[in-house]
Amino acid sequence: MKKILTLLLSLFVSVLMLGQEINRSYQVPLFTGIEAGGIFDITLTKSSQNSVSTTSNKEIAKYINVSVKNGLLKLDLDTDSMPAMLKRNTKYIKAQIAMNQLDRVYLSGAAKLKSSGAFYPATFRGDFSGAVIADGLVINSEESSVQVSGASKVEIKGKFKNVKYDISGASVVTIEHESTDIKVGGSGASKMEYTGTSTIANISISGATNVKLKGSATTASFEASGASQLDAEYFIVRDVEIEASGVSNIRTNVTGTISAEISGGSVLRYAGNPTMKNIETSSQASIQRIK
């Protein structure tokens, strides 16, 4: 009986301690990037001074590792050293980060990020994988490269000179910005909604990717294969080159010229009064005007 009571008391104390939250602040060197995975829920704020703090259960706090290497802030949870009971009862760890400049974001696992404030790095790199959720990012940069994979959901606004997006898996990406040159590569069952203006737009998608564009570009190149869908009816371009294969579907709005190579069971639908420059169709492919 005493052993049972002792065991129950120990269990009660352990559960009670799991419910206690503590806040910890960390003294770290200057950083301009963030790397986090697992179950970190990050609130990012633009500030003139850098700071980092976490809020978590008291027993879990000792397993949180915060470090900076080559200007990259790393948030990590040492699950290898954690007792099994802690692993089973671990909830999201809240992290509060303030920084003056942001040029890199690498998130994985089930990490979350909510950002406020605009950042102006010369270059920006973003990598979001797993089941990441990131929104509120406002980036203004000369050069940018963003990769989104898995079941991640990412929202980015701002202004870029040259920007490249690679989306895959079942990821969902929402973009709102101006750019000089935008490149998008999509595969799997990924989805993207883009709103903005660009001088040059190059979109290449495959699989069951779905991309919707709103805004305008001077020149554009659209390539779609598999069962992908590219809806650019409300994305007005002057001149466009199009290549469609498989059973892909492309909608476009053109004021200047269209050059197109359409094959398989793919369909090209267009709005506007463009000049048909170089047109090739084969198999069951078709070109139709949007009425």
Positions of PLM-derived features:
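Short, surface-exposed interaction patches in beta-rich subdomains
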Residues: 156-158, 173-185, 189-291
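Beta-strand-rich extracellular passenger or scaffold domains
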Residues: 108-115, 134-135, 192, 211, ...
